[in-house]
Design a protein with these regions (language model features):
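Metal-centered catalytic cores of metalloenzymes
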Residues: 1-132
């Protein structure tokens, strides 16, 4: 799959403004459009693939994600304050932990997707669904 075109200066400025409004770290950019049941994914490129990755829907922060590899867990690695939210007062509603034995696009090795959601499950499961 070919890489998407680099964002324009105007798009970069818009992303910087959105990231600042959400309280995300400087240099955070949108890395995907709206993913069904999750929302847009935002991150600092240097933090990938582990994360943190931030989920945004309609201008609202809805999750923080980490993707530690299976090897990292096997080595006994720890992550302290890894899911600290940029707006620390957001209350985590629930956490989804999924093992990806084959990986997925963007991270094709066995790993865990750990999403700490700030919205109810019923809400994010309705995000960006394809037309039926």
């Amino acid at each position: 799959m070919p890489a998407p075109p680099a964002p324009t200066e105007e798009q970069m400025a818009e992303m910087a403004q959105t990231a600042m409004q959400l309280g995300l770290p400087a240099g955070t950019i949108k890395i995907s459009e709206c993913v069904p049941t999750m929302g847009e994914h935002w991150a600092r490129p240097q933090d990938l693939p582990l994360g943190p990755i931030y989920g945004v829907k309609d201008g609202k922060l809805v999750f923080v994600e980490l993707m530690p590899s299976q090897e990292m867990f096997a080595k006994g690695m720890s992550w302290v304050d890894a899911l600290k939210t940029p707006k620390w007062f957001l209350k985590i509603n629930h956490v989804d932990i999924e093992f990806q034995p084959q990986g997925h696009e963007g991270y094709p090795i066995p790993h865990y997707d750990i999403h700490a959601y700030f919205v109810p499950h019923e809400e994010h499961l309705g995000y960006c669904l394809p037309p039926q």
